[in-house]
Amino acid sequence: MNRIDSRIKKVLDRGEKFLCCVLPLGDPDLKTSRKILEIFLQSGVDIVELMLPSQDPYFDSQPIAESNQRSLLAESNYQKYFETIVEIRNDYPDEPFEVMTYSDVVKNYGISRFVDGLREADVDAHLLADATAIAPDVVHDMDPLLEDAGIYRIRFMPHPFQEHLLDDIAHYARGFMILQSISDEAGNRMNVADGNREWINRVRATGTRASIMLGYGINNPARAKEAVNVNPDGMIVGTAVIERIASKDYRGLSELIRGIKDATIP
């Protein structure tokens, strides 16, 4: 069984929601990233998303974009990132890891070479953040390579909800899929709107084998409680943890993660 499936089943069987947090590799440097990963795991993170920096992470927040730039200034050689992921896997052979990046990184590194790097690091899943937006060519070439390597490609449902993605999610999504939470017209998320429940139910009604993870705007325990109330299987936290990494507030990082994880436990 894929480590992601095994971990999600274990968490859901306890009646909890699983928690995924984004680890920006290379921010502030690769050595420190490994120490931050230890904080993640000790504080209750169930699944770690290892983020490879992109020049244009346009689906993400300004703090995440700035984190990507700090990573690239610290280390621009992607081979070093893959070497670090191999070291991480050696340190944590049983932990589920998903690697996220954008198509510019994959294209520049080379699609086949990129998947080989994931395979050599024994990664469980990969999220191509802009897969459905601007990179169908990359998806076309990458999917069979990922399947051959036994690596899940994580699906992403953006807001506004896109009906045409449901068929792919129903038939091909594995592990988990990410649902971008509802925002207002200015893109703000002052809370986790109850309307997210409808979209979660729509995805679940497809019969997909992927667990549903809600993301964007979950930045503290109160928001996590709101997320629990709309009944996803799990949630992902990015900006809030990256802001604490940027300020080197590692105690606050651990407290944040523990608080959010506690909010997922009945």
Name these PLM-found stretches.
Residues 1-11, 30, 54-66, 73-86, ...:
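Active-site-adjacent beta->alpha loops and helix N-cap segments on the catalytic face
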Residues 6-28, 61-62, 67, 88-100, ...:
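N-terminal small/glycine-rich loop or linker at the start of catalytic domains
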Residues 19-23, 48-50, 97-101, 126-128, ...:
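Hydrophobic faces of well-ordered beta-strands that scaffold small-molecule active sites
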Residues 21, 40, 51, 118, ...:
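Conserved, mostly hydrophobic/aromatic
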Residues 30-41, 112-113, 160-172, 218-235:
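Catalytic cores of alpha/beta
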Residues 45-57, 121-135, 177-188, 230-250:
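Glycine-rich phosphate-binding active-site loops on the catalytic face of alpha/beta enzymes
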Residues 101-122, 228-239:
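Short, electropositive alpha-helical surface patch
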Residues 151-189:
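Histidine/lysine/aspartate-rich catalytic loop segments that bind and position anionic ligands
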